[in-house]
UniProtKB/Swiss-Prot annotation:
NADPH binds at S10, W11, K31, K105, A140, R255, V279, E281. It catalyses: sn-glycerol 3-phosphate + NAD(+) = dihydroxyacetone phosphate + NADH + H(+); sn-glycerol 3-phosphate + NADP(+) = dihydroxyacetone phosphate + NADPH + H(+). It holds the Pfam family NAD_Gly3P_dh_C. GO terms for molecular function: glycerol-3-phosphate dehydrogenase [NAD(P)+] activity; NAD binding. Its EC number is 1.1.1.94. The gene is gpsA. SUPFAM superfamilies: 6-phosphogluconate dehydrogenase C-terminal domain-like (SSF48179), NAD(P)-binding Rossmann-fold domains (SSF51735). This is Glycerol-3-phosphate dehydrogenase [NAD(P)+]. Belongs to the NAD-dependent glycerol-3-phosphate dehydrogenase family. PANTHER family: GLYCEROL-3-PHOSPHATE DEHYDROGENASE, GLYCEROL-3-PHOSPHATE DEHYDROGENASE [NAD(+)] 2, CHLOROPLASTIC. One of its GO terms (biological process) is glycerol-3-phosphate catabolic process. Transmembrane segments: none annotated. Sn-glycerol 3-phosphate binds at K105, G136, S138, K191, D244, S254, R255, N256. It is an enzyme of class 1 (oxidoreductase).
Length: 332
């Protein structure tokens, strides 16, 4: 099989390495020439996955047309804000019958579309049935190291979900299939916002009780938004919902949790992301998820609080107090 991964960041490189490790011929595309040169010459990506030796069947190209030539599987692994321009550039080179797997997690700010909605907005209608989403608790660094990981692959066509599942399945990477694309997308996007809240809680020393409450109530508001968008609520209790949320809220590998800890220490989100050298999707998603919730009439107090901390200058401690002092109500 020939596969193309659009995006050579940490996640794109980890998935490209996984596919190449199965013996597939894989081409990574990116706009960063230095990263591509490192992959092509040294079989490494020291910027995003330092210390990892990449398989010799992983190649690199800075030309979209060349990278997609003969591709039987396309993985879209760019940051959420880059999905539309990259798909616009790539659409002439993708053909019906080729599965397109989106691993970007976000809601487009201008349109409030999920990533697959953005892709469908750009691609010709005959390509829409071949879209899939891969999401779940999966840090790139651990996948690249071959540590056991389980994820969800969602597609509207069961045949496509199964095809993608088979392509990615290894002895250390186990995908489960689902037909709930929107549930997987909302879970994967909004958990990043809750993870910022988790980082704030941890950074301010609020303890385990607060963290448990935050994860539970965070899942509740993620589920409300997903269901309003047409998702099956059970999806949010699975890998793409609860699983991804727990991982991102609890691990020091989480960029979004790191942003929250930095905010608790008085840093700005911009300064924290410069230190990280990578995108923390929750910063952008806090704004778009809040706007989508307002449009759909969904109450999302944690998302609202993080938006105010990031964009209105609300002090993290005041945000916590505001959450705790909201009007009392039944849990369910």
């Amino acid at each position: 099989m020939r596969a193309t991964v659009l995006g050579a960041g940490s996640w794109g490189t980890a998935l490209a390495s996984l596919l190449a490790g199965k013996g597939y011929t894989v081409t990574s595309w990116d706009k960063d020439a230095a990263v591509l040169d490192d992959i092509a010459r040294n079989h490494r990506n020291e910027r995003y996955l330092p210390g990892l030796q990449l398989p010799p069947t992983l190649h690199a190209s800075g030309e979209v047309a060349k990278a997609l030539e003969g591709a039987e599987l396309v993985v879209l692994a760019v940051p959420s804000h880059a999905v539309r321009p990259v798909v616009i550039e790539a659409k002439r080179h993708v053909h019906a019958g080729t599965p397109i797997v989106c691993v970007a997690k976000g809601i487009e700010l201008d349109t409030l579309m999920t990533m697959t909605e953005v892709i469908e907005d750009v691609l010709p209608v005959p390509l829409h049935p071949y879209l899939a989403v891969l999401s779940g608790p999966s840090f790139a660094k651990e996948v690249a190291k071959g540590l056991p990981t389980a994820v969800t692959v969602a597609a509207r066509w069961e045949r496509i979900a199964k095809q993608v599942q088979d392509a990615f399945h290894t002895k250390t990477f186990r995908p489960y299939t689902s037909g709930d694309v929107v549930g997987c997308e909302i879970g994967g996007c909004v958990k990043n916002v809750v993870a910022i809240a988790a980082g704030i809680s941890d950074g301010m020393g609020f303890g385990a009780n607060a963290m448990a409450a935050l994860v539970t109530r965070g899942l509740a508001e993620i589920t409300r938004l997903a269901v309003r968008k047409g998702a099956n609520p059970l999806t949010l209790s699975g890998l793409a919902g609860l699983g991804d949320l727990v991982l991102t809220c609890s691990s020091d590998l989480s960029r979004n949790r790191t942003v929250g800890r930095g905010l608790a220490a008085g840093k700005t989100a911009d300064a924290i992301q410069r230190e990280l050298g990578q995108v923390a999707e929750g910063v952008r998603n806090a704004r778009s998820a809040r706007e989508l919730a307002k449009r759909l009439g969904v109450e999302m107090p944690i998302t609202e609080a993080i938006y105010r901390v990031l964009y209105e200058g609300l002090a993290p401690r005041e945000a916590v107090t505001a959450l705790m002092m909201r009007e009392t109500k039944p849990e369910l």
